[in-house]
From Swiss-Prot:
Protein name: Biotin synthase
Pfam short name (any one): Radical_SAM
InterPro entries registered for this protein in UniProt: Aldolase_TIM, BATS_dom, Biotin_synth/BioAB, Biotin_synthase, Elp3/MiaA/NifB-like_rSAM, rSAM
Cofactor: [4Fe-4S] cluster; [2Fe-2S] cluster
Keywords assigned by UniProt, alphabetized: 2Fe-2S, 4Fe-4S, Biotin biosynthesis, Iron, Iron-sulfur, Metal-binding, S-adenosyl-L-methionine, Transferase
Group of enzyme by EC: transferase
EC number: 2.8.1.6
PROSITE patterns xref list: RADICAL_SAM
Residues annotated to bind [4Fe-4S] cluster: C67, C71, C74
Entries under HAMAP family matching the protein: BioB (MF_01694)
Disulfide bonds: none
Binding note for cofactor: Binds 1 [4Fe-4S] cluster. The cluster is coordinated with 3 cysteines and an exchangeable S-adenosyl-L-methionine.
Length: 327
């Protein structure tokens, strides 16, 4: 097992050519004294980014509910009895209107999500039109459409997509407790297709799903050992929804969430680390510590797919208090 000091020194090189991080390495980092860990992460953050700048993304569900997957955290699954109602796919005009509003609010990236295992060809053609129109507005484009088949990533790239999101969700050893309908390797296969097509990768996970600290270390290791590392790493704090299997999960202590952000920054120094789901349940002080620990991106807007998010006015107020500026 490497000492925490040795692990910290290794972090100076972003996007390693070979996988170097071990679960023991990352667990040692997560166990550092809290103030020391945040300080180290803040130092690394400043080597690669302006700490006063935050990237703003808006996420919209273009097709809600009716998903055949059984992800234990998700209210859109047909396997769970939740308040989320199925909705048809949005029209291109509806998506463009949402993108215009996001841009007017200050977002620089517009993300589109769809609840299905993966896009059928007919659905993909509709999403290609959405990507083209959103790109024409001058926004960065991102999509999270599930598992991709051969050639689909290339079509999205040709339409103007910048980022493709496909999260690993949790550590490999924990994965079977959360999802049964898709394998971990399925996720890695889609990430490989995305890279091969020349798209930037957005890939992160969820904490607060009854996992151990070592499980969180295992997730970070999987992300940090991707070659190259993801350009964007969303870190979600579980939003518990009535009717999902993870309703009633033990809530993650706020210090553990900040530790997770800090270690994501140390192990992936050149990636954007995004505060994603769960921010509405965090107080401003916790969010401020996350920014200090290296978070430099947020989802911006009052809704994330089907769960709540701080409204634009609240986020503008927080950023003003912290002297943060949008990228």
């Amino acid at each position: 097992m490497h000492s925490a000091t040795m692990v910290f020194k290794r972090a100076a090189t972003p996007h390693p050519e070979k996988a170097e991080w071990s679960v023991d390495d990352v667990e040692a980092l997560l166990g550092l004294p809290f103030m020391e860990l945040v300080f180290r992460a803040a130092e690394i953050h400043r080597q690669f980014f302006d700490p006063t700048k935050v990237q703003l993304s808006t996420l919209v569900s273009i097709k809600t509910g009716g998903c055949p997957e059984d992800c234990g955290y998700c209210p859109q699954s047909v396997h769970h009895d939740t308040p989320v109602a199925d909705q048809p796919m949005m029209t291109v005009d509806e998506v463009v209107a949402a993108a215009r509003q996001a841009k007017a609010n200050g977002a620089g990236r517009f993300c589109m999500g769809a609840a299905w295992r993966g896009p059928k060809d007919a659905d993909l053609q509709k999403t290609l039109d959405m990507v083209r129109e959103v790109k024409a507005l001058g926004l960065e484009t991102c999509a999270t459409f599930g598992l991709l088949r051969d050639g689909q990533a290339e079509q999205l790239k040709d339409a103007g997509l910048d980022y493709y999101n496909h999260n690993l969700d949790t550590a490999p050893d924990k994965y079977g407790d959360i999802i049964q309908t898709r394998e971990y390797e399925d996720r890695l296969d889609t990430l490989g297709k995305v890279r091969k097509a020349g798209l930037s990768v957005c890939c992160g996970g969820i904490v607060g799903m009854n996992e151990t600290r070592r499980d969180r270390a295992g997730l970070i290791v999987q992300l940090a050992n991707l070659d190259p590392q993801p350009e964007s790493v969303p870190v979600n704090n579980l939003v518990q929804v009535v009717g999902t299997p993870l309703e009633g999960a033990e809530r993650l202590d706020w210090t553990e969430f900040v530790r997770t952000i800090a270690v994501a920054r140390i192990t992936m120094p050149a990636s954007y680390v995004r505060l994603s789901a769960g921010r509405r349940e965090m107080d401003e002080a916790t969010q401020a510590l996350c920014f200090l620990a290296g978070a430099n991106s947020i989802f911006y807007g009052d809704k994330l797919l089907t769960t709540g998010n701080p409204d634009v006015v609240a986020d503008q107020s927080l950023m003003a208090k912290l002297n943060l500026q949008p990228l």
